[in-house]
Amino acid sequence: MKNNKYEIDMCNGTLMDKLISFSLPLMLSGILQLLFNAVDIIVVGRFTGSQALAAVGSTTALINIFTNLFIGISLGANVLAARFYASGKEKEMSETVHTSITLALISGLVMALAGVLLARFALNLMGTPNDVIDQSVLYMRIYFLGMPFFMLYNYGAAILRAVGDTKRPLFFLVISGMTNAVLNLVLVIVFHMGVAGGAIGTIVSQLISSILVLRCLYTSNTSYRLYFSKLGIKTQYLKQIFQVGIPAGIQSTVINLSNALLQSSVNSFGSVAMAGYTAANNIFGFLYMSVNAVTQSCMSFTSQNYGVKKLKRMDRVLLDCMILSVGVTLTLGCGAYFFGPELLKIYTSDADVIRCGVEVLAFTTVPYFCCGIMDLLPGALRGMGYSGVPMILSIIGTVGTRIVWIFGLFPAHRSLSFLFISYPVSWILTILMQAVCFCFVRKHVHQSVNRDLA
């Protein structure tokens, strides 16, 4: 089904070209979102100093913990909307849209309140050094005031992705990203507002992107048109969104808790190592966006084809996504490894900080294709409506391995290099478990659909 030039027909025609057409804007959108934070880091690091850089970086894991639960729930909205849209269920599609946008607004307000009230407590819990904690608290509190806008954009974009439209969300992020860059330069360099200026620039850019995506839904003439008078929670659709979204959100949140533990281990090396990890982690994030784009493509394509019972096409979606993910991540990972020092110099001129950043990149870039495979299998399962078991396996494989590594092995081998070997080890173990799970679920789904069609 295709209603306008922005949408992609996921259920008919060749696959690889459509996956690329869908994934590329999604990948660029993710990179632009990362650039919001990257601009903060670069401008603050260059014009305010390494302590301010460490302050901004120390909030990243915590921000991800707070946000990823609710962003994970938006995946449930994406899966449900894709299924209803492909099968032509217009009433159900409309109810899903209005429930999702209402949920986004409520989630954003809750997160804003929690972030403002709990910032200092959470940062102290992570062992943030005294020389940066005040700036970290200030940045985090201001940043979280923009959470309602952040959530509205993400849920609105999830609806557009469900119908095959990834181009307009990209356009919206180009506009808001340019605004963010200009505001950061003005507020930090001209008005000397430090970390506060970086956070304010991000809030304004998120406000703009949320207005644009809501306007897009409001002016649509399709089943996903937004009527503000219809906003509200419909329990039956909320349950279905939660069925897929909550396990995905919990998985993402718990994995980020393990990253917060890892951040605490990095903090024990001091502010120089923290700054190096901050810069390297930002580069690392660009790799993740390539993985995440292909994973979300796999989930959306699988969900639409599941809605119209095209089982063979679902299998082909996973295979083509696997080829695409491995190719992209190997290329980008090798590039990040070989050009690591040059990339880190964009963020800071401090030689010690660059050295620490290179140490982190050495064990996380080239093997990153394993992370892509690890994420694709649960993505395909969520597209079929199965989210609980992949969550449990990901937590055991990823989080369990890192906890054992940090508390069991790391104390006897204290170095950044040894700390970050835990990443590829956890990816490989999780792939093995997810592959077994996928085979069982795929067999069950095929049997169930074939019975329905008989």
Placement of each model-derived feature along the sequence:
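Helix-terminus/linker motif at the lipid-water interface of multi-pass membrane proteins
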Residues: 35-54, 123-130, 186-193, 253-286, ...
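Hydrophobic transmembrane alpha-helices of multi-pass small-molecule transporters
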Residues: 65-68, 180-184, 210-214, 286-289, ...
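Short runs within selected transmembrane alpha-helices of multi-pass transporters and secretion channels
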Residues: 74, 143-161, 169-180, 198-211, ...
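Residue-level signal for short hydrophobic patches within transmembrane helices
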Residues: 12, 16-35, 39, 62-69, ...
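Hydrophobic alpha-helical transmembrane segments in multi-pass membrane proteins
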Residues: 22, 26-34, 71, 103-112, ...
